[in-house]
Swiss-Prot record:
Pfam families linked to this entry: PEP_mutase
Source organism of this protein record: Bradyrhizobium sp. (strain BTAi1 / ATCC BAA-1182)
Assembly information from the UniProt record: Homotetramer; dimer of dimers.
Class in the EC hierarchy, top level: lyase
Record-linked SUPFAM superfamilies: Phosphoenolpyruvate/pyruvate domain
Family matches, as CDD domains: ICL_PEPM
An MF annotation (GO) of this entry: magnesium ion binding
Protein family according to the UniProt entry: Belongs to the isocitrate lyase/PEP mutase superfamily. Oxaloacetate decarboxylase family.
Superkingdom field: Bacteria
The name this protein goes by in its record: Oxaloacetate decarboxylase
Length: 288
């Protein structure tokens, strides 16, 4: 599937009538597993990227180059469309333009640009937002930076939990007026908040998370939520699995005593072993 085709799949999801959960992906193995299990979309979150690439928490330490390189590896490994958390665009509006270009070239189906002030400012006790004017500039730069018009650009705001619901709506409407393809919200914890946002905007909505009492897909779909994230449990589970395996080995366990290891069949599937063997026969065996 071409990069353009992957982007069209994401656009179809956003313009549809359903709400889906994406698979949280962060490397070649996780994206192949998500694809094999039938997920329609992958989500490459900033926290997962920081942990997978750097082993660090999500405090804006990862660079654009590191993020794009990891996205490129996933694009090569599978054809599952991926929505990328591009954080603040790695600088000002000029940097945002470059961010879009790099992630587009890396095969992202879509990306989010947020209005959080990143990295955290000196002396700041809690998250802060950039001004609406600067946020608009970043969104405009993102839209103008894409070479493929099919690349999905989402305006993202965390204003609901940082400033106010009214500010979140004002920012969302401003980003909508700029021409973004959808709106990404974090910090929504109550139905009346989502109801107000849905009533004040017209674009597809992506939720960065929602409490259990708001998890009904029918309710979310009726509020134009087309994608609802469920956190990044896969990388957390992988971390625990590696820890338990190494702990057992360090404690004297024999490899055959280890629990939770994948079957040979699953390992072969994730490695696409059958296809690799076919290529070896075709490319390297005489007379093939």
């Amino acid at each position: 599937m071409t990069f353009r085709a992957r982007r069209e799949v994401l656009r179809t999801i956003l313009t549809g009538e359903r709400c889906i959960h994406p698979g949280s992906v962060y490397d070649a193995i996780s994206i192949r597993i998500a694809e094999d299990l039938g997920f329609e979309l992958g989500m490459f979150g900033g926290s997962a990227a920081s942990l997978a690439v750097l082993g660090d928490p999500d405090i804006a330490l990862i660079t654009l180059t590191e993020l794009a390189d990891q996205m490129r590896r996933m694009s090569r490994a599978a054809t599952l469309p991926v929505l990328v958390d591009a954080d603040h665009g790695y600088g000002n509006a000029m940097n945002v333009r470059r961010t879009v270009q790099e992630l587009e070239a890396a095969g992202a189906a879509g990306l989010t640009i947020e209005d959080t002030l990143l990295p955290q400012a000196f002396g700041a006790a809690k998250p802060q937002l950039i001004s609406l004017a600067e946020g608009i500039g970043k969104v405009k730069a993102a839209l103008e930076g894409r070479g493929d018009p099919a690349l999905v650009i989402l305006g993202r705001t965390g204003a609901v939990s940082v400033t106010s619901l009214d500010d979140a709506i004002a920012r969302a409407r401003a980003y909508e007026a700029c021409g973004v393809d959808g709106l990404f919200f974090t910090g929504i914890t109550a139905r009346d908040q989502l109801d107000a946002i849905a009533a004040a905007t017209t674009l597809p909505i992506v939720l960065g998370g929602a409490p259990e009492h708001m998890s009904d897909l029918g309710y979310l779909a009726a509020r134009r939520v087309r994608v609802a994230l469920q956190g990044h449990a896969p990388i957390a589970a992988a971390t625990q699995a590696v820890y338990e395996t190494l702990k057992a080995l360090r404690g004297g366990a024999a490899p055959k005593q280890l629990k939770g290891l994948p079957s040979a069949e699953l390992t072969a599937q994730v490695m696409r072993e059958a296809e690799v063997k076919r290529r070896l026969r075709v490319y390297l065996e005489p007379g093939s």
